[in-house]
Amino acid sequence: MNVVLSKSALENVSKHKYSGIDDSILAKLILQKYWNFCLKFVPLNIAPYLITLTGTITILLSFFIVGYYSPYLEGTLPRWVYAMSGLTLFFYQTMDNLDGKQARRTGSSSPLGQLFDHGCDSIVCTLQSLIVASVANYGVGYISLIQLFITALLPFWMATWEEYHTGVLHLGPINGPDEGIIIIVCALLSTAIFGNAFWTFKPFVASSQLLPSIIQQWLPTFIQQLMLNEIIVASLSLPCLITCFFNIKNVVQHLQAKQKPILPALKHILVWVIITVSSFIWYYTSTNLLPLSSIWFNNIRTVQFSIGIIFGELVSRLILAHMCHEKYNIIQAPLYPLILSTFCSTINYFNGTIIIPENLLLILFTVTSFVHYSLFVKSTISQLCSYLNIKCFTITKKH
């Protein structure tokens, strides 16, 4: 949907200055030196947005290649595919950090750069989550949903939400964009070397002979049967939730210092809640009514990617609202396709029969999500470029 920015909104955007703090230990010790070294090889006439887009396209290609070999998020892939997925992610991280450096080096920094960069990041978040799900053999199930919504989308939303209210994007000493990506890269490359069998390894079963009988009796059966990939998702969920707690703490302290109401700010978290709850309900109703032919089984990547597109637009709208100094509404148009699809699937479930064909539902959901997001991107970039007197993919000479 086209977004019409008011004159006051555009004026606020033109005055916006990005404020970010990266306390990453790894970045300070190693990565910053590596990125500065790479920057020397980037020609001065290359636009920062082009660097951002190049990294995003690389992840998109990786997503399609992995999807070709693993359409259902499981199975053994060729070793080169694992290696490719790790190297493309590392390349993306490099590009994601070079764009800002290139903008400052060429004097082409602009508010559009922040929106474009973080907007691409929000899409990559879902793409990379699905790539990891295939490599780690998550398959179609709640484990892949938890991995996407809890360990990927939630931290991204909360960090952006904190920035909206405090004006600062603060990354901690150990964070996802730096340490998190390097850990994933190492995991992907390790899979290329050793194969993917270790992801489905059951450590409690393998160590049953070493565990005292009292511990074996105490451990519930479902825990004893946990695979390594499931243990990893559970282990990653906890620090993600802790990080979100500190996001909330920082916002509350900031608002209290400014003597502003807290509840309206907390309501913005409902956007992530709506996306997550709707997706889980849709998955449950669809897979229980159609155990073998559900679109969540046959088209899991398409469904989750479309949800990621919706998430990406909502994140971009939050960033835009922050730059425009405007209020952010909880219920917005990008949510409608997901809410409607969940509603239709729920009707099918409670009627015990297919009233609304799922294939039709999938087509409408996917097309609507992509078209809506595309129009938003086109409209927003066009208006910002026009008002700021810049071009998106070429560096505008300043007079």
From Swiss-Prot:
The keyword Transferase applies. Its main location: membrane. Pfam families: CDP-OH_P_transf. The chain crosses the membrane at residues 46-66, 76-95, 139-159, 181-201, 226-246, 262-282, 303-323, 330-350, 352-372. It is a multi-pass membrane protein. Keywords: Membrane, Transferase, Transmembrane, Transmembrane helix. One of its GO terms (biological process) is phospholipid biosynthetic process. GO terms for molecular function: phosphotransferase activity, for other substituted phosphate groups. Disulfide bonds: none annotated. The keyword Amino-acid biosynthesis does not apply. GO terms for cellular component: membrane. It comes from the Eukaryota. It is found in: Membrane. Belongs to the CDP-alcohol phosphatidyltransferase class-I family. This is Uncharacterized CDP-alcohol phosphatidyltransferase class-I family protein 3. It comes from Dictyostelium discoideum.
